[in-house]
Amino acid sequence: MSKALGRGAGILLPISSLPSPYGIGTMGRDAYDFVDMLKRAGQKYWQVLPIGPTSFGDSPYQSFSAFAGNPYFIDLDTLIAEGLLKKEEVESYKWADSDDEIDYARIYRQRFEVLRKAFGRSEHKDSRDYVDFIEENEQWIDDYALYMAIKADHNNREWLAWEPAIKKRKPEAMAAYREKLGEDVEFYKFLQFKFYEQWMPLKEYANRNGISIIGDIPIYVALDSADVWANTDQFQLSGSLAPAVVAGCPPDMFSSYGQKWGNPIYDWDVMEKDDFAWWKKRIAASAKLYDVIRIDHFIGIVRYYSIPANGEPKDGYYRQGPGKKLIDAIDSAIGSSKVIAEDLGVVVPEVQKLVKESGYPGMKVLEFAFDGNTANEYLPHNHAKNYVAYIGTHDNDMLKSYISGQSEELQEYMMKYLMANSLDDGAEKMIHALYMSSADTVILQMQDILGKDNSARMNYPSTLGGNWKWRLTKGATWEFTQEHIDKLRDLTRLYGRNRVKTYICKEDIMLKDICMKKYNKEIKDCTNEEIYFALLDMTKKLADGKVSEEGQKKVYYISAEFLIGKLLSNNLINLGVFDEVKQVLAENGKSIYDIEEVEPEPSLGNGGLGRLAACFLDSMATLGLHGDGIGLNYHMGLFKQVFENNYQKETANPWIEADSWLEKTDVTNTITFGNLKVQSRMYDIDVTGYENRTNKLHLFDIESVDESIMEPGGINFD
């Protein structure tokens, strides 16, 4: 399985930043609407920040669990629709003073009050879905729910401040707290049930619409987490269970001071003994939540920066990480999901080697590119294919502030490189340069699409408070407008990043151009029949662009019948343009489903072998196998059998019309039957594979057929 993402584009917008009347983004209606917007904008990816429950400081990278979801993201309107909440009680709270900022303190105080009410009205314990959910997640949910309940009982202090017996998970203490806090434990399980109950349908909806979710997981977990409390042997802790060393990084392009994250560091030697079992569980859980997993601080897998617990970043030192051994464990657990390696920072040759060996795409950030050195690896013209390119991440300046904050010398260099006329034009050209990059995938932050400055920046590394607050607004209309959507869609088409894999925008195959050339009409003025034939032309040209003679061997499937059925929608789907064509038609007041009805239904005959032969051809093309079909073109059509007055009768049944999918070739053969000679000619039909190659079905027809033998009721053999 390829680990590359393929050429595409996406938007980084945290769930927390979605519009919502309840102070923070949720998995409700606005999330689904955003998926629709991504689709219309030709995007393939929605990247989110970590979705776990946040702790003090509100950072999604410091979560109480590597497995749990953030209860803040549970949609309250959905709970209202389920009868668990009343709209008036939800609206009685003031959730925020501003639509574009999250007030985390207020959310913390009020959200759990409301969710407690929903919990009190729920009959989830009687639900088979709930029982199944608990069983499927038993490896983490019991520890997590108990951890959160005990933490709340201890005035939200972390587990190191608990009494020794429960800190060390003594069996008698565990049993006592389960009994004492049973209702609270159940509450936290209920929240996870509701989170997953809302997240999985949202992900499914995104996937159905061609959007993949890129999730972000920190390489390290928080000290204040159920993960560390329940797995102390997996971390480098002291005898008192406090961290002996903590994670961070030395001074770099993100911070001249360096960063001290405070996360405990894994005991990789211990983890290796059970083949990284905890990591496998974590990755498998993440693979259910996301289609693509971005591993933050990937370089820590090769070598990690270890800072004495009481020291500063400059006091730290590098130690060897698990490297390829952990990558192999991840690959064994990840299923069909893919990985992005966040390889930013001080990248040594060992890191570059591991990223290459893993096959994971790395990252490029344009805000690191403009130092005056044309060999800078982050400049778009130096990007390699298997990368994900960003203008900036959540840790960077907004594009507008980044450009204005550079020295005059670098601004001049930047404008020259981008061929920009002004700083504002430079921001626009930077987005074009990103899309133009050779990197397979590009991701834009929503704030940069909207032209925001640093007032909308998500995070300033090495600072506490004031981060992770920005929200997209939605009054009468979304702040992310149709104009933004149209611009992105045009960029994806222009630079071959459209959600579909073909370039429908080329002038000679653009539907509107074909209609104009063929009928001198706009799409909206064409009849359904005219649009049908225009789509035939467009589809044939698209299919022809995917014909290949690659491969030293070729399969020929010979059959008396190939019963292929209607082809228009099948070909549009296989070529990856059905949704785009549907949208173009809708914008012109037409329906793809009405156009489908114009196409005659070719006979499916009276047996199954002809249908099976057609399916074989479709499968070969979809699998990328070099193979064509050879058969007969039924000049007068097939026949169908009916019974009239207890007698069998044959009547004519339509076949493929000559002016539709059949392409006449120059290949002819003279066939001799004794003294009779007949001339045959080969006709071709494109066989499109799903997102793959185009093969051919070669059908031979006799040119000298006397069509007068066909009577209205069929052929009279008497």
Place the predicted regions along the sequence by residue:
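Conserved, well-ordered alpha-helix/loop/beta-strand core segments that scaffold catalytic motifs
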Residues: 188, 192-221
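N-terminal catalytic cores of NTP/NDP-binding nucleotidyl/phosphoryl-transfer enzymes
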Residues: 10, 14-33, 567, 603-607
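Glycine-rich, histidine-containing beta strand-loop boundary motifs that form or position
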Residues: 13-15, 47-52, 215-217, 296-297, ...
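Catalytic domains of carbohydrate-active enzymes, especially glycoside hydrolases
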Residues: 4, 29-54, 288-290
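Beta-rich nucleic-acid/ligand-interaction surfaces
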Residues: 54-57, 220-224, 348-349, 374, ...
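Alpha-amylase-like alpha-glycosidases and glucanotransferases acting on alpha-linked glucans and related
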Residues: 2-7, 14, 20, 58-193, ...
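A conserved ligand/cofactor-binding region detector
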Residues: 501-718
